[in-house]
Amino acid sequence: MSGKPAARQGDMTQYGGPIVQGSAGVRIGAPTGVACSVCPGGMTSGNPVNPLLGAKVLPGETDLALPGPLPFILSRTYSSYRTKTPAPVGVFGPGWKAPSDIRLQIRDDALILNDNGGRSIHFEPLLPGEAVYSRSESMWLVRGGKAAQPDGHTLARLWGALPPDIRLSPHLYLATNSAQGPWWILGWSERVPGAEDVLPAPLPPYRELTGLADRFGRTLTYRREAAGDLTGEITGVTDGAGREFRLVLTTQAQRAEEARTSSLSSSDSSRPLSASAFPDTLPGTEYGPDRGIRLSAVWLMHDPAYPESLPAAPLVRYTYTEAGELLAVYDRSNTQVRAFTYDAQHPGRMVAHRYAGRPEMRYRYDDAGRVVEQLNPAGLSYRYQYEQDRITVTDSLNRREVLHTEGGAGLKRVVKKELADGSVTHSGYDAAGRLTAQTDAAGRRTEYGLNVVSGDITDITTPDGRETKFYYNDGNQLTAVVSPDGLESRREYDEPGRLVSETSRSGETVRYRYDDAHSELPATTTDATGSTRQMTWSRYGQLLAFTDCSGYQTRYEYDRFGQMTAVHHEEGISLYRHYDNRGRLTSVKDAQGRETQYEYNAAGDLTAVITPDGNRSETQYDAWGKAVSTTQGGLTRSMEYDAAGRVISLTNENG
């Protein structure tokens, strides 16, 4: 055996119960569900670097997120880590991943899931209807071709919420990291066949993300081009609330032509851009094959709640280098909010980045492509030294932290940490890389009991020997907690998995009622005294009205971006909120016209507050957004910081 985690349906656990999670035919020793690396964004240091990978990472920068069920959230994740089995480069360029950059490679001897964090997760091949669970990654992969999962299966309820055509298709694969969903649906895009294509065309040896589906039957759909240069690429999205988005994509050839045209028409055209400086095609990189297709802008095309009031500009916009690397990000006000720089010799390897109004962070790499130094011009810098099963992190104050690791690939974990003050902590893990014990610097040990398959915590034993136990239902939802003193708290759920009652350790129960079978939002809550509160929600999941137990109602209004614009209390008491085109709160006005105003700097720091009587308070910041002085009523208080960002001097208004 390889020692890697595996579970087969029907196997008996140490407690005598059969395993209903896992594949019906897991090969013992197969690398089922093991990732090529730890999560790039899992453990970070500084601004930020993953020291276990030696990778520069930027975990989850969100550019677009409107409220609603199954919302279209457009975010970017960067990692300089290169997997040996990469998917094609995504729409943000090498090193970057979007939420939709999920791809399943179908091989004779393996399934390789390329996730949107830049990893490759290896599974065994699945027969129609089979499901497999990765204990190390807490992820399910299921192949269609089965009407229902067995009774008691963790996914039985979520699987049954899928449309029959999805459940029964053996050509579709589905993935999820929660028994409450949503599902990531992995299919293929329809293509217009060419004149020389053999019909019917065979299915491709991969699957792409075609949509999401939740336990209430709501869906998010990606529309991919069927013909032309953009064949197979996502150009439209319909979210779970019915909004429609258009994704504007450009090819490398289009960007090259635009750059040459711009160069020729520029007033500074003494040295026109050459074809070699901005090639029409891009070579493959260590991050995968590259078609050169990039996302340049996202437009909101339809909004059911605001059909006549659509934005006149894109919600977000992107520009790229001549090598197809993400260069800059612009928000809906067309303000540049991010900038990136890359290594000219290694396309996609980020060497610097900057936020609007902030200094530039820089990075150096060794010959193996690992970050060895990050340079902060206005704060702490860090150096990284890599040895076998040991990483040393030293900051610019010469403080040293040593990480001792065990395991490989996706099971690599820090088991011992030597801190700068000389203290040492230890951590223990099971065969799936899940935390089972922690020992602090004083030698006090806390232990975690885990469900052998799901990884849910079943008990926690503290250093004094006191034990807390946790119980779950078939859907891995917490149903009871028994404290060391024997007192118990309980939770109950309805068939779709919504919380319907919650009983505290003291025996008091709060109950939740739902009016909409297709929503997880409660209509009423009733506490232990019988007092009931009522809630009304918008189609986007925003609270429209709240009625307390006395019958008093508060109403709320929002704009198309989900920002609260008004609050109406009883007896005509109202507050109105206004925002600038970047979404920052600029004023709050009451029903009598009294207004408080807010001002900001380029970085988004609040620099001034002007009260209704005209009094003005101001705050100034250093390069990293720490307040260095506040002035109110002509009096100033100032602060100074050391390189680690700690306050070393505070001067009050009296000097």
Where are the predicted features?
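Acidic, aromatic-enriched beta-alpha/helix-loop junctions
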Residues: 81-101, 108
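Intrinsically disordered, low-complexity proline/glycine-rich segments
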Residues: 1-49, 306, 313-318, 338, ...
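A general structural signal for short secondary-structure junctions and capping/turn motifs
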Residues: 56, 62-69, 103-104, 112-114, ...
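Intrinsically disordered, low-complexity segments enriched in small residues
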Residues: 30-83
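Extended charged/polar low-complexity repeat regions
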Residues: 92-94, 109-655
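Segments forming oxygen-rich coordination pockets for charged ligands
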Residues: 46-47, 101-104
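Hydrophobic/aromatic beta-strand elements that line small-molecule binding cavities or substrate pockets
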Residues: 24, 62, 184
